[in-house]
């Protein structure tokens, strides 16, 4: 319990996955915090605005109360007020003629010569005027004896340039002197110039600041006074105190820097750190307002000295802890989460990401955070109760109030900010994914659909900024939120500054500081800093006379060059001109009770309207890209019909085929219905829409061709029944590729297309069985396939998906999904994974990351091709092409270019990074633009672009260039298998496997002239994972480039695979489909990486390399032990000899001679016919 109260930096960071059961003592507190945070998160914008307005009103109230109702100036031009805070010193033969502090009654020292040492300070900002000021210019009483003393300088005297006069006078006569020097004539050289001014009715004089009437000065005057008082405070303070304060302010600013750096590590450069500072500022304002209302005396000096140390001691650790927990749980919630229902079944969590993250973070960290606040507040309360002197008692009360409000705002205001941050992160991920998919060539509608489905789970599907937001919405929201807050505060301050007081004068900021210091303790006086030289002079005189002396050193008395009318507090409204009068009159008119009520009603209506607009924004806007009308008839006329081999329309009834014998399959197909029912109601088929509504009625095909043409002209294709659509398509009236758009139902379009292909006369002999075949087509998200993955869809091909593993890769366990129809492959990979795990797991290294595209350009002569190559290889060419290429996408970045010449043909190999997308379409767009810039701006207008892909990439083909230079991700994976694991799990030995690898993978592949094929079955594993995770299967050609190496390392088997060209992506292409996306979710690499673009794709490449490592290990062990054929026979065949044809085993450990039929080598009938012609 005691350890939990310590800050986390003293206890070490705990795991996010470590769940602590809630004790009965903190369950109620946690529930309360979760309720407050949930309320704030449900309406974050309203919460932020409400608290911001409340805090703004609080400090404006502080200013107004101080301006208009604050007490009068504490300092008075009276002896009783000036002598407060003075210090008395005594010297004489009894103490060796040394100054000694004396705090007793002066009457006790009857034989002492009691002197009052006074210091008059005239500001140096008035130039020559201060030189003419002298206290002896004032009319002094005749019996008053004044001794002139040397002034005392300080290190800041050169900067302030103040004129200081020091003198001593009998203590009993000091009040008369104070009354005489309240006003001192100004005999400067500028006096004649002042007398010539006609407007001037009185002469300026040096007036004691404390003698002025309580008038409200301007902002410039307040700044000047504050600066002067700060310099005086520094001059009178001890050097050690100044050093401590400087260190305190430096530490405070370092704490601010640490806050920004910590938030930057969490993914926020400015936003969250600024919000934390804003929350703390609001807490300070609320605490200060409550403290003043409770009667706690405050002063600007006390605040300026105490706040830096409060910031350093308390810090922002609690806000950082809560932020880290919320963001971490938000990332966890993006993965599929499961909960156990009351009935024991597993159901998906419907809670939104924001609510889940905040609730879980508060459940884990909320109690500890509140405990830290409570401990800190208790310590401050104890300090206040103990009565610490020197103003610290008052500051302890203020600090306790600040921490209380800081705790309250942390779970309301700041959690609302965090909810907005999470929504901004979701919006950024959504927009970045959508842009990346659009760069990959997907339509905007498909990209939006995929990006929406990849958002975090949200049952309500309501967002703070609406459903249709652009990438510029996030910075616009931040900008206008900050601007709005600043405008509100500036208006509040401006209204306060220009609001007229009861006497008609303008407000003064100095009144606030004076009211805060109304009952504060004055700072202790340092006599030797104030009048060190004067004390030395008095000591010298007392020693010479041999008389004991007592000196009372007063605080410096400051003067200002003012008009004598300052005593009357005259209005200075004319200094502000007509504008100030107009603003003051306007603000005064608002004090009218009727007008103020109307203003309140208008404000209420504004709040209600804004609430309505916020609600409307949350509902979002419908996607305007959804099709609202059928395909243009002009496009229909130009489209190619399905029945291109026959012009006349076949009879629909004659196209029906006899139903096949029904066989049940795991997936619903048309053959699942009764055979006789299919035959009887083939023309009465009822098609169901995706929305569950009936699309067609059970009407026989009785319309004539003329009626169908008339209906077609009316653009009512979607209202026709299936048989009518088939008839129109067979006549070429409805193009097959446009069925989805025409019917507005993807599943129905796939079904109709199957019927059309089955009834096409040109291929009816082969395709007649397709309409009622076992190829499934229902219950599939065809909307994602449309315009993205496949065209002319007739169904989907289910492939078994197994999982190999688990396998430990770089210290983390994975199950590897593999889509394959080859038996033993998954089991073999699992056996290899087990052996790797027993050896400590696989270790991977990323050696390269860059997708390539190699266009071909041609010039008329070789010299121009050579010049282009030299320019492209130069720094200038590289820079120009990089700028042109990078301007086409926010994700693709050109790394390098490699060029080669063949005659007048120039081949350029662009190598780029593409984030988490595989990026071929993205690169093609960038290459095209870069080549256009090269032709138009680089002086190669005679360049002829032959093709964007000149096979110099090289894509989907074996290539030594890919093997040497790499393409996509380059991965090296290694594992060390102990000898006993090789013996017990792999049933082999280390030396046998090393020798097998040399003979098979190295020498055997070299003898075959292989390029990148120095492995046993890398393509097997790569293809299975490619298909399961939505990769391009054709790119297995180069992705399976691999060399397997084995070595006997101190008795253990060291195995590694090097794969320089794994071409994968976790965004776009087949990864947008839900089944493939689910497999990526199982690996934790779906979509784009939240913080490091491209990291998900690189991690997928590491997983593939490690899976290949497991497969290589297991297969080589089986080959070394001679178990391969036996394993395949056991897993793939029910009996050793089967009449059913079996697929070939690849690779095989043994060889069997199969007799070849005599007619197998004969040419086909078509080949014989071509030979005759």
From Swiss-Prot:
Residues 241-420 form the SSD domain. Pfam families: HMG-CoA_red (PF00368), HPIH (PF13323), Sterol-sensing (PF12349). It is a multi-pass membrane protein. Compactin (also known as mevastatin or ML-236B) and the intermediary metabolites Ml-236C and ML-236A are inhibitors of HMG-CoA reductase involved in cholesterogenesis. Their hypocholesterolemic activity might be useful for lowering cholesterol levels in the blood and reduce artherosclerosis and coronary heart disease. It catalyses: (R)-mevalonate + 2 NADP(+) + CoA = (3S)-3-hydroxy-3-methylglutaryl-CoA + 2 NADPH + 2 H(+). Residues 647-666 have a biased composition (Polar residues). Pathway: Polyketide biosynthesis. Residues 647-669, 1132-1173 are annotated as: Disordered. GO terms for molecular function: hydroxymethylglutaryl-CoA reductase (NADPH) activity. One of its GO terms (cellular component) is endoplasmic reticulum membrane. The keyword Membrane applies. Residues 1133-1148 have a biased composition (Low complexity). InterPro entries: HMG-CoA_N_dom, HMG_CoA_Rdtase, HMG_CoA_Rdtase_cat_sf, HMG_CoA_Rdtase_CS, HMG_CoA_Rdtase_eu_arc, HMG_CoA_Rdtase_N, HMG_CoA_Rdtase_NAD(P)-bd_sf, HMG_CoA_Rdtase_sub-bd_dom_sf. Glycans are attached at residues 143, 186, 886, 997, 1132. It comes from the Eukaryota. Keywords: Endoplasmic reticulum, Glycoprotein, Membrane, NADP, Oxidoreductase, Transmembrane, Transmembrane helix. Coiled coil: none annotated. Induction: Expression is induced at the beginning of the stationary phase, which is consistent with the timing of compactin production. Expression is controlled by the ML-236B/compactin cluster transcription regulator mlcR. It is found in: Endoplasmic reticulum membrane. Its EC number is 1.1.1.34. The chain crosses the membrane at residues 242-262, 272-292, 302-322, 368-388, 397-417, 479-499, 594-614. GO terms for biological process: coenzyme A metabolic process; ergosterol biosynthetic process; isoprenoid biosynthetic process. HMG-CoA reductase; part of the gene cluster that mediates the biosynthesis of compactin, also known as mevastatin or ML-236B, and which acts as a potent competitive inhibitor of HMG-CoA reductase. Compactin biosynthesis is performed in two stages. The first stage is catalyzed by the nonaketide synthase mlcA, which belongs to type I polyketide synthases and catalyzes the iterative nine-step formation of the polyketide. NCBIfam families: HMG_CoA_R_NADP. Belongs to the HMG-CoA reductase family. This is 3-hydroxy-3-methylglutaryl coenzyme A reductase mlcD. It comes from Penicillium citrinum.
